[in-house]
């Protein structure tokens, strides 16, 4: 996160650190939405993945940190791996549920559509340098605003005129999500309204907001998968 501050240690109990499973390279963020389920971006998918819950600093370990791996992964488009504009979402069923603790608790899905102009909060362990990847040891948090979708249309090549994505950022270019923040939460009104999908290169440019997968638009799919009514798993 560019231009953010270290998150309060108690404000990100739902934030998940996603690692490549073989060499423990940090990949992305994710969000705990249920004791057994995590939501993240599809482009964060790797053959092997490890997920860490209750983490603050990567270099320190809390007593209540928990590690899990995917039991099953669900995508919107069953037999495809290529990411498209508005389907950058993945549900992960954990190998076993996590337990709520001082530093671990799920975040609610949105009950209403997001409102343009809303003050929202983005967080993650991603790059704190807009031009070269310098990952943060602790999660950084920044306040950004939701903008009209048309503001993002045209900023990204081949982007459709409509899509299930949110456009959010600081138009002065001071605060933004960045590389390796992907899959992490965009929180508005204390609900999960978006997950980091993609943004301008370099990050945090004036009048160039980033794109977030709109969770409200996938709410039914998420609930159906969790209820066992969907079979879209590779």
Curated annotation (Swiss-Prot):
Residues the record marks as carrying a glycan: 23, 79, 99, 148, 229
Subcellular location: Secreted
Tissues of expression: Expressed by the venom gland.
Enzyme class name: hydrolase
InterPro entries on file: Peptidase_S1_PA (IPR009003), Peptidase_S1_PA_chymotrypsin (IPR043504), Peptidase_S1A (IPR001314), Trypsin_dom (IPR001254)
A GO CC term assigned to this protein in UniProt: secretory granule
UniProt keyword Acyltransferase, yes or no: no
Active-site residues, as the UniProt record annotates them: 43 (charge relay system), 88 (charge relay system), 182 (charge relay system)
Keywords: Blood coagulation cascade inhibiting toxin, Disulfide bond, Glycoprotein, Hemostasis impairing toxin, Hydrolase, Pharmaceutical, Protease, Secreted, Serine protease, Toxin
Gene Ontology terms describing biological process: proteolysis
EC number: 3.4.21.74
Peptidase S1 domain segment(s): 1-227
Cystine crosslinks: 7-141, 28-44, 78-232, 120-188, 152-167, 178-203
GO molecular function ontology, one term from the record: serine-type endopeptidase activity
Catalytic reactions on record: Selective cleavage of Arg-|-Xaa bond in fibrinogen, to form fibrin, and release fibrinopeptide A. The specificity of further degradation of fibrinogen varies with species origin of the enzyme
The keyword Disulfide bond appears for this protein: yes
Superkingdom of the organism of origin: Eukaryota
PANTHER family linked: KALLIKREIN-1 (PTHR24271:SF47), KALLIKREIN-RELATED (PTHR24271)
Functional description taken from the UniProt entry: Thrombin-like snake venom serine protease that acts as an anticoagulant. It cleaves fibrinogen (FGA) to split off the A-fibrinopeptides (A, AY and AP), but not the B-fibrinopeptide. The resulting fibrin polymers are imperfectly formed and much smaller in size (1 to 2 um long) than the fibrin polymers produced by the action of thrombin. These ancrod-induced microthrombi are friable, unstable, urea-soluble and have significantly degraded alpha chains. They do not cross-link to form thrombi.
Family: Belongs to the peptidase S1 family. Snake venom subfamily.
Subunit structure: Monomer.
Protein name per its UniProtKB record: Thrombin-like enzyme ancrod
């Amino acid at each position: 996160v560019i231009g953010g501050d270290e998150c309060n240690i108690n404000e990100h109990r739902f934030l998940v650190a996603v690692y490549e499973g073989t060499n423990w390279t940090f990949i992305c963020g994710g969000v705990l939405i249920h004791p057994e389920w995590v939501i993240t971006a599809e482009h964060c998918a790797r053959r092997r993945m490890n997920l860490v819950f209750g983490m603050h600093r990567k270099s320190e370990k809390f007593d209540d940190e928990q590690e899990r791996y995917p039991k099953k992964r669900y995508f919107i488009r069953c037999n495809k791996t290529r990411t498209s504009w508005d389907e950058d979402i993945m549900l992960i069923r954990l190998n076993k549920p996590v337990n709520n603790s001082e530093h671990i608790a799920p975040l609610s899905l949105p009950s209403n559509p997001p409102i343009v102009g809303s003050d929202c909060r983005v967080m993650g362990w991603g790059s704190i340098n807009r031009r070269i990847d310098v990952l943060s040891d602790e999660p950084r948090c920044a306040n950004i605003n939701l903008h009209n979708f048309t503001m993002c249309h045209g900023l990204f090549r081949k982007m459709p005129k409509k899509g299930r994505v949110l456009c959010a950022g600081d138009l002065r270019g001071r605060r933004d999500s960045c590389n390796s923040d992907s899959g992490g939460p965009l929180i508005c009104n204390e609900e999960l309204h978006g997950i980091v999908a993609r943004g301008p290169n370099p990050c945090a440019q004036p009048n160039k907001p980033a794109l977030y997968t709109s969770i409200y638009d996938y709410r039914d799919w998420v609930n159906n998968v969790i209820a066992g009514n969907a079979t879209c798993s590779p």
